[in-house]
Amino acid sequence: MNKQTIITALLALVALTGQAQEKKQKDIYMYGTVADGFTKASIPDVKVILLREDSTAVDTTKTYESYGYSSGIGRHPSTSRYYFQIKREPGKYILKAEHPNYETAYANFEMKQVGRRLQDIEGPKIYLKKSANAHHFEGGQLDEVVVKATKVKMVWRGDTLVFNADAFNVPEGSMLDGLIKQLPGVELKDNGEIFVNGKKIDNLTLNGADFFKGKNKIMLDNLPYFTVKNIEVYKKQTEENKYLGIEDEDKKEYTMDVILKREYSIGGSANVEAGGGTDDRYKLKGFGLRFSDHTRAVLFGGMNNINESMEYDTYDSDYKDKSQQSGDLHFKQVGGQFVYMAGEDKLTNSTEVNATWSDEYNENRSQSETYLNTGSTFSLSEGTSRSKPSSFSLKNTLRATGKYRLYSTAQLNYNRSRRESEGWNVTSADAVMKDSINSSWYRSRSQSDQLSGSGYAYLTKRLSSGDSWTFDMQGSFSRQYHPESTSQNHYVYHQLGTQDHRDRRTESPSSNYNWSAKVAYNYNLTENLRISPAVGYGTGDFHSDRHEYLRDSVDYLLDAKNSYEQATQTLNRRASLDINYSKNAHRGYFAIYTTLSANFQRQRMDYSSEPLTTSITRNYTLWSPNVYLFYMKQDSIKRQDMNVQYYLWPTTPSVTDLIDRPISSDPLNIFLGNPDLKQSEQHYFTMSYSQSRDSTDLNMSIRLNGSLTHNARTQGYTYDTTTGVRTYRPENISSGNWTIGMTLNWSRALDQKKLWHIGNELSLGYNKSTGLAIATRSTNAELSRVGNFTLNDKPNIRFQKGKLTLQAKGDIGYRHIHRNITIGEQPTDVWDIAYGLNGNYQLPWNFTIDTDLMMHSRRGYTDSEMNDNRLYWDAALTKSFRQGKWLLKLRGYDLLGQVSSLRYSINSQGRTETWTNSMRRYALLTVSYRFSQKPQKK
């Protein structure tokens, strides 16, 4: 595209912008709120009349409900808003508010000179006084559930999917997770992740408030189901965009909001559970809520040894997440949250505190195959480990709104880790483990203490012109104290007939500090078009030392060739431009958001060791374009959404990977650097379409996604077939690493009474990974390319009538593996199939029975012991007393003693099958008590 074409396009854009501004600048929207003068509660359906100064009518409207949200604070009480479109010129007006249960009220408003690009202006808040003959229940938001003969389970209200909690048969004594598992189209995973129609929930909130964000298990495992009125699913706009009046679909969070019943939203409630069982199993848990007009307090805690962690960090690995079935976990936790909200939403503050202690014992057995260009090697290993981590976190969130808007967070964390492990490993050139290459056993112990913190402040100002500016600053620090590990390792090289024993101690202190700041200006070109240029600056400082010691016959001596000290400084200079266009169409909405971001990054590392002392400086230009399209159409019959997104994510190599020197503290795994490493670029693409119909509870969605990595970094290695030593060197693979996938999710009611619901989630995926593993003395340097095709299908059908709920479900998983280098016979097809029934029934005399029966079948695993059929059976019987205040529950876990935990992983360098110990079957008897203090009626 030449320069003349660009100039012509820009002039055309300016001309169109000017015409649009001229057309729209004559009018402006005025909005305001109406509330009860005594309770300050919002009043719906108030008739508001706009009058001129001479009392002649201009326009008439009615108020409607609007909810406000604050990140980290939550959903504020609803407000009743009115809107008028008035002339963009100075003038005086009178607003008249009428309601059958209130006295008529008046408010004056003076329209002053405003900027041409200002789209709306706030009018007066009108307070009404209750009339003498007002209906008892009018004038506030009682918001009670309407009970019908057949309760509606789910309904769309605008862009919000609402589930009625009282319409589901949830077993007595259940927490929030028991309710969510019954919602049509909703999947709850063991790690606390929630998917609605195949799309992952970004944030699980309580009455709109962030509640230990990223740790869904805290609420899922502690909030009693009977406190819940509705569960709402919607896209929540960011707090800053709400203040600025910006509608940005790309930045919205997919949110599941748990709305409490009124008696638990104002007043207090508590739930305590305690019990014991076979094999010395025990459980103690408590959860308390206290609400008032301006405060909310939550206190929770518990301890158990039945693998209930009550916490989940979204950044942990997938394997650790599934600790519910694997390992033997003793867990303790205590935490709380306190929220204060000042009048008229001017100031809100939230404080969260949480402390955990764990004691986990694991046994594992694995069988792996490592791909080489000339064949494969095979390994067997067994090991045990015991870890005792503990943590403490304190977080505060503050929001203040006035002429400026301030939002800030501050967080402090302390983590303590203690771990012991031991085990053995053997590597062979053949699958039957007869041609051994090497073997080893180990015993290790490690400890570390880490203190970290972070802070964020965001300040914004909306100008009279309708534009706005924002300034934000953030910083963080972390420091490790006393990080030390000791290990004893014994190696046997069978083909050489030699042995090696090492007793090693490692000290690895580290610290990290960084800060950044950004300023942006939001310029409204027209009512539909906005541009936002921004610039930012930030620095980081990272220190990481490693001091290795080897023990001789007397004491530990410094291993100088494997010890080093390094310090890295990073400088980031960022610039970005957002161009956002949105338009309301007939019964629909269309938006396109584009971002072009550049980071001019400078990295400098000073590296010091006995064999090598050097400094490295690198400069990168990191481009991050992002394009997002959104379209929504809704009528009285159905709602449709479509999203398309593309973005590019560049990453730079670790500076330590650029140091070309060997690290041989582990004699079987030697690590080199590569000074020629390049930055990697990951291209992501997603497209989704969803449709819903209230008449049949239909929810359907289809999602396509793909990724392509250019210059992917991989740890290529050379393998010594005589000793089994791997010499690693990071390499860039220019192509051959990509993924593509499709997910189809749908659910609907089968009959008019909606007693039957059916659903299915089908996902297909293909992953291509490319790596480099070369055997020594080999002349063939062909890359290893592995294709991994996966299919997963989860059908289910549910029946609910009266006190009975039954569900049949399945989970069919299939994996096909293909390598470009095929030597000998290799298993290429793996099946994991599960199917079964679960249900609950409310028996006479306040008894409830709940059971889950699933058959798990595995085929295609290399280890023949893993190819089996196992029948899992859990059951519970509950009895409630004194109108549900007391509850006795007998739970049986793995009644048939069949639960087994397996994990299968594969990439371009090999595949691994891992078995981990599972908690043994047990029976547990618990008693729980729930207390509720309802607000006094005035």
Language-model segments: which ranges?
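Short, ordered, surface-exposed loop/turn motifs in non-cytosolic proteins
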Residues: 39-64, 156
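Short Pro-Gly-centered beta-turn/loop motif in secreted/extracellular proteins
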Residues: 71-79, 83-92
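C-terminal beta-barrel architecture of Gram-negative outer-membrane proteins
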Residues: 808-880
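Outer membrane beta-barrel strand-and-loop segments of large Gram-negative receptors
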Residues: 382, 559-566, 672, 678, ...
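Outer-membrane beta-barrel translocator domains and adjoining extracellular loop/strand segments
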Residues: 244-246, 301, 310-317, 361-378, ...
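Membrane-proximal, glycine/serine-rich, low-complexity loop/turn segments characteristic
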Residues: 21-27, 49-55, 89-91, 96, ...
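Structural motif
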Residues: 25, 33-44, 55, 151
